[in-house]
Amino acid sequence: MNVTVSIPTILRPHTGGQKSVSASGDTLGAVISDLEANYSGISERLMDPSSPGKLHRFVNIYVNDEDVRFSGGLATAIADGDSVTILPAVAGG
């Protein structure tokens, strides 16, 4: 399945400055693997190394505006033409 992935500014150095990229996969996990295959190092910014198979807690990912934390996480199904949005959490004081 081909999807469009919106890349936040903080991750654009991994995609050569591109705001959005194409990726493929039938689950979110497969899409992230495809991103890593094409944009080395990007998955390290998304995945929690202390919890294999889990996203960093400060990374929010949406598939068609639905938060994947409530729709299956990395197992979230992806359909052709879906949009994936990556949003890093922002904190301040």
UniProtKB/Swiss-Prot annotation:
Q: Name one Pfam family in it.
A: ThiS
Which positions does the record annotate as the modified residue CysO-cysteine adduct?
Answer: 93
Positions carrying 1-thioglycine are 93
- Kindly state which keywords UniProt assigns to this record, in alphabetical order: Amino-acid biosynthesis, Cysteine biosynthesis
A GO BP entry is: cysteine biosynthetic process
Does Secreted count among this protein's keywords? no
**What does the UniProt induction comment state?**
Up-regulated under oxidative stress conditions.
List the record's Gene Ontology CC terms alphabetically: cytosol; protein-containing complex
Top-level taxon of the source organism: Bacteria
Q: Does the keyword Amino-acid biosynthesis apply?
A: yes
Q: In which pathway does it act?
A: Amino-acid biosynthesis; L-cysteine biosynthesis
Read off the InterPro entries from this record: Beta-grasp_dom_sf, Mopterin_synth/thiamin_S_b, Sulfur_Carrier/Prot_Modifier, ThiS/MoaD-like
PTM comment: the record says: Thiocarboxylated by MoeZ. A covalent CysO-cysteine adduct is formed by the action of CysM. The structure of the adduct seems to be first a S-(glycyl)-cysteinate which leads to a N-(glycyl)-cysteinate after a S->N acyl shift.
The record's similarity note reads: Belongs to the sulfur carrier protein CysO family.
Summarizing the function annotation, the protein's role is:
In its thiocarboxylated form (CysO-COSH), is the sulfur donor in the CysM-dependent cysteine biosynthetic pathway. May be of particular importance for cysteine biosynthesis in the persistent phase of M.tuberculosis.
Protein's recorded name: Sulfur carrier protein CysO
Native source organism of the sequence: Mycobacterium tuberculosis (strain ATCC 25618 / H37Rv)
Q: What is the lineage of its organism?
A: Bacteria, Bacillati, Actinomycetota, Actinomycetes, Mycobacteriales
